[in-house]
Amino acid sequence: MEPQTTAKVVLTTTKGPIEAELFAKEVPLACTRFLQLCKSGYYDSKPFYRVLPGELIQCGQQEAGNNTNSYPKLKDEPHTRIKLKRGYLAMASEYTENNRRVPNSATTEFFIALKEIPFSGTVIGKITGDTIYNAQDIARGELTEDGYPMYVQTVQNVEIVLGGGLVQETQKAGADAGADAESRENKSGSRDRPKKPKRKLQVNHDDDDDEEPVFTKKSVSKLVEDKFKKDNTNVAKKPKVEASAEQPEPAAVQATTTHHVQDAEDMTTEVDTVVSERLEKFRNMSRTKPDTKPKSMLISQEDRIRRRLGLGPDEDIPSDASDPSSDEDDDFDIFKHKFICPEDDKAEDSLITLGA
């Protein structure tokens, strides 16, 4: 967005007035020079000596007899938000034989653009209202073979409508801008200077009794332990407060806590004892090999014969009786023999049939 103008002048020409507003705040150096020239009457009776129809008209050429050193060259002040459009004023620069603009060469001349022109110099203002047509009338004049206007149009006088009191302010702003430019140049020049060697500052710590702290990396558990130690130290440093009647006695609390701790330890001991006993029993069981037959089944050969013949424990065994476990008497049927219960002497003989 284009900035606002802060000054205004009216150029009275032979074709009519041309009202121009200036960007005095954005381009202080060029606007200061232009306002000074207008106030001193420099542009009075100055011709528009250069006319390019449909392109531009230029004014403010210095006469050959004037001292050109009284108007030093201005530094270019291009602005990113101010472009050279139709009806805008700009400070004229010098050009080489190859038609190349010489930077930082503007002095007193200005020109009015009649169309948008690519320009990298300093644009100082713009024409307002319908007075742009008076500038176009100046460009319509006839030209000679050399390209100069046949009927020269001139600036009769210049009136400062707005910003007459800003000449001093613009001078101050221009001086500040020049100082800033010089300081920037000095800074840029100072960058090229060789750097001074750096000197290390040595400090003698012999008189200091305190040693520099040594920082070590600690684990989380170590940090927590240090924190609890610090908290316990702070608690020990706190003043003792008398216990009220409502609060329990510290001794009773300590005794209760000790009792619970003792119970827990006893319970742990009992559990360990039971577990140890069961483990020992299990180990003994695994070490002992059980008999292939129960003790009740291990009987002698005579007892087997007595049971086979149905004899009591005190009765004699017949000489022709054989062992029931041998293979000599396979036809003997144990279920057909009579068994007598020795416990019941008075009872009659009863026939017990096995497997019934």
Swiss-Prot record:
Catalytic activity from the UniProt record: [protein]-peptidylproline (omega=180) = [protein]-peptidylproline (omega=0)
Entries under InterPro entries matching the protein: Cyclophilin-like_dom_sf (IPR029000), Cyclophilin-type_PPIase_dom (IPR002130), Cyclophilin_A-like (IPR044666)
Keyword Nucleus: yes
Transmembrane segments annotated in the record for this chain: none
One Pfam match: Pro_isomerase
Biased composition annotated in UniProt, kind: Basic residues: 193-202
PROSITE patterns: CSA_PPIASE_2
Domain PPIase cyclophilin-type: 5-205
GO biological process, one term: protein folding
Compartment(s) where it occurs, according to its Swiss-Prot or TrEMBL record: Cytoplasm; Nucleus
Similarity comment: family membership: Belongs to the cyclophilin-type PPIase family. CWC27 subfamily.
PANTHER family in alphabetical order: PEPTIDYL-PROLYL CIS-TRANS ISOMERASE-RELATED, SPLICEOSOME-ASSOCIATED PROTEIN CWC27 HOMOLOG
Protein name: Peptidyl-prolyl isomerase CWC27
Species for this entry: Yarrowia lipolytica (strain CLIB 122 / E 150) (Yeast)
